[in-house]
Amino acid sequence: MKTFNANCLLLVSLLLILASCVIPESNHVRPTYHLLSELGAEGNESLPPGEVSFYVSQVELPTYLQDSRLVSRPSEGLIEFRENDRWGEPLEEGIARVLGLNLGRRLNTFSYSVYPHRKKVSCMYDLGITVQRFERIDSESILLEAICEIHFSKKVNQVRFVKKIELASAGNGEKSANQDVRALSQAIDEFCGFLALRISSSAAGDPDD
């Protein structure tokens, strides 16, 4: 009888040990990583190739945009971070990269560099970008607000840019993070068009610039 009880106790102990080794199914969802992209802006053929050179210095962001997670601000004073959608590079570097690509194409030049790379020698324009808003603001749109200081020929011209873009719906009618990122890329492209006009006018000697 004692042997039977001992065997039962041993069997129960083994079952408990095996049960403790079972790994529960994970609820972890791997995040999706996103990159801002160039949208193929048209070049300015009125400018000779390489006529303009520029440098995009380190983009300044508010603290909440320095997080790797995509951000939404559905109402004033409320921020929502998306755990499963993240930037694939530091956001300030991604914005500078796409600014350089789009602005270089619009100004018909390869003579540019962007942070974190060093400024090229004899650079004509130094652009200091401060981004104040860069996120989805409701279920239908994103918002870009930025200030740019254009340093040229010992002068500084400060300009402000605001752009709201409606989101395109996915096939099922929902607004996904991919639509957000594409709309944010479009906002940067339009910001570059705005800056290119300013730079082109100063390069042409516009007296009002």
PLM-predicted stretches and their roles:
Residues 1-10:
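Bacterial N-terminal signal peptides that target proteins for export
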Residues 78-86, 155-194:
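Short secondary-structure boundary motifs at beta->alpha junctions and helix caps
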Residues 21-92, 203-209:
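A structural "domain/chain start" motif
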